Amino acid sequence: MPGYHVPISGPMMQNPYHSLGHLGTHPDQSYLHASKTGKGCKKGNRDCVYPDPPTSKSSKSKDNTSQKTSPKSSNDGEDADMDRVTNSLQTILDEDEPEELSSEERSDSQLSGSKATGSSNRNVTTRQSTESLSPDGIKESSPSVSTGGSSVTVAPSIDLNIPTDGRADWSHLPSDYQHYLNYFVENITSFHYSIMHDADDFFGTVLPFLAVQHEPLLNAVVGFATYHATLQNPAGKLQDFLKYYNKSVTLLLESINRKEMNNILNLITILQLLTIEEYFGDWINLMGHQKAAFQVIRKIFTPDTVMHTPVGRACIDWYTRYDCYVAIMGGFPTDLPREWFNRMNEYNESQLGASPDEFRWKISSRSTQLRSISYDMSMLYARGSRGQIGPEDFTKEHKRITNELLEWKSTWDAALSVPEYLVTDFSYQRDVVPGDIVNPYMLGLLYEQPLFTNTLITTEWTSIMIMHLSQSSDIPAEQVFIEMAKHAYTICQYFETVEFWPLKPKGALIPLQPCISIAALFLPRDSRHQMWVRRKFALLDTMGFIHPTTRRIKMAHLFRDPSCAHWWLPNDEGLTPILQAIRTFADERNTAAVNVQQENIREVRHLFAKMEAAELALTTGNDVTGHVLN
């Protein structure tokens, strides 16, 4: 099998479940050519400990105001929850940057109209409904709702009355905030959040509208817009983004310290900050955000109530994507139990039953089904890596999930495959060049709206198959590697199909970033394939999706080219000053992992281990399961 032979380093897998704690090793640090700064990474060196959630907490009826006026809460469970959220967020502020905006950039009197914490919100609207909602998505009926040993506190209601034109009024805000909010609605889509299907147009309409109500969220959303705008500005400065990001973090911590955790606007703020950390490749802080979001979700939602409103549905979709992704990549269980995923499926099925011809519910149903399978995968891998399941049971469950994945792929609703939405005009097709590795103009891959999600979710399914194959314990490594290589080519084809389509939605390549990163590990090692991958990685970096230092070092070792640890392309092609500044900033935040789980995620050790095991089998004639290769 020419092209796959690479020197093997590091220990091989010690058990059939590919435990993530001991797979792979760091290459020589001399591969890292990125310039060093004099500052240490305050975030990376801080040890964050996330206690297990309490088994129960007492019900309470006090509102936020009474909590704020009392120096100490009599509810120990409440204080514990607050501490968990605060601890989970403590790492995220960039302490080397100023926390306040300059007087020219921020007017307290102008922003005061938008400043709202848990107990005081301006009335707003939604075009989907004019019903009165509490910030947790539960219709107000009583001060506290019992949920089997825990309580959900109902905070004052917000009326979501979004104007018919779908635009919020932010004319009272400072000009820079207005500018970046306008940029957000014109240029940022759900795809920038790696959300492939936004059934309620949450990211396009609701999110900017909610941001105007809550200053921490406002600064997070404006910061996200500024980040993307700055990348496209040759004269852009890192501080242009950081001033909003730091302000959001500061205000969020202040809000939480005032015991205002049960506030859906704080939850959305945390999720927005979490998204920013994903762009930085900052898994240390990302996991802190995730833990904080989990604590807030379990405080203000139940599996049933979360599906009652567009805001709740968007939050749970947003959160569970991270919950499953982080769990699978790190080899540990999801935080949310299966019940939450079941309710998502049941809700979408009920909506589909009521409106069987609506594309959005068909697509939502497909998406949540795949998310539920991802949940099953994460739980199996976690049990396997911890020795909580025997080899035979692991193999049986692995096969069951394999069958579920194959069934998901083969049972698409015919309405989602209607040919009228297939892209058939490839007049933009370019000539074949020597560096090409796939045909991105094949009919049947690319759908236009409203079925464009088909193209993205099929790519995601293919990457999930690679992840699942990497955990197989009873198939010869060579066979698994060949199957993963086939899937890798498919991902590359889909990626380039979307990349070259002139009519692709804004941000359409962002959800494919994890897919192409996984595929890159299982392509041939010749210079043609390597340069193809490096160009795609460079493209994603220029979009703001930064590959962290440890990942670049791994790929430099894989490609046997130390320069990749500095930049993907020769002669710093495409490495603009602002991109270099952002990458340096991201590198500082990624200096050190604070626990084993975070290091596992940063390095995707189990995938590198599977690849190395297969290559060892090819070079020695034996695979790690004991099979002799013919």
Regions found by a protein language model. Name each.
Residues P2-M261, I284-N630:
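Intrinsically disordered, low-complexity activation-like regions
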Residues I270-E277, I516-A519:
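Short glycine-rich or small-residue beta-strand-to-loop segments that form or flank ligand, phosphate
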Residues F280:
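The substrate-binding groove and active-site-proximal loops of carbohydrate-active enzymes
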